UniProtKB/Swiss-Prot annotation:
The keyword ATP-binding does not apply. InterPro entries: CyaY, Frataxin/CyaY, Frataxin/CyaY_sf, Frataxin_CS. It comes from the Bacteria. One of its GO terms (biological process) is iron-sulfur cluster assembly. Pfam families: Frataxin_Cyay. Belongs to the frataxin family. The lineage of its organism: Bacteria, Pseudomonadati, Pseudomonadota, Betaproteobacteria, Burkholderiales. One of its GO terms (cellular component) is cytoplasm. Disulfide bonds: none annotated. GO terms for molecular function: ferric iron binding. Involved in iron-sulfur (Fe-S) cluster assembly. May act as a regulator of Fe-S biogenesis. This is Iron-sulfur cluster assembly protein CyaY. Keywords: Iron, Metal-binding.
Length: 112
């Protein structure tokens, strides 16, 4: 994948994560605030002040996630982002992380 293809896919994925979280905040008891700065998406949980950070790493062609449960690297395989350690899909993994840190079960939707 070229760098421009990676950046386009990473940008679309960050946009989708943010949109999915905003939809959940509007339709559930999930109280989060998303802040975007370039290739970094910061998800802040208002109730407890914890955060999840998702950012793209162009040199590695990966999305990195930092959460209470640890740090994770996801590599694009077709239209999905797969954890380089355990093979988990990004949106499924983020759903679990957001559920744990937010205190309510949520499912983030991937538009693909």
């Amino acid at each position: 994948m070229t760098e421009s293809e990676f950046l386009k896919q990473a940008e679309a994925t960050l946009d989708q994560i943010e949109a999915s979280l905003e939809d959940l905040a509007d339709t559930s008891d999930l109280d989060v605030e998303c802040t975007r700065s370039g290739n970094v998406l910061e998800i802040e949980f208002i109730d407890n002040g914890s955060k999840i950070i998702v950012n793209s790493q162009a040199p590695m062609q990966e999305l990195w996630v930092a959460a209470k449960s640890g740090g994770f690297h996801f590599k694009a395989t077709g239209t999905q982002w797969i954890n380089t350690r355990d093979g988990a899909e990004l949106f499924a993994a983020l759903s679990e992380m957001v559920s744990k840190q937010g205190g309510i079960p949520v499912v983030l939707q991937d538009a693909n």
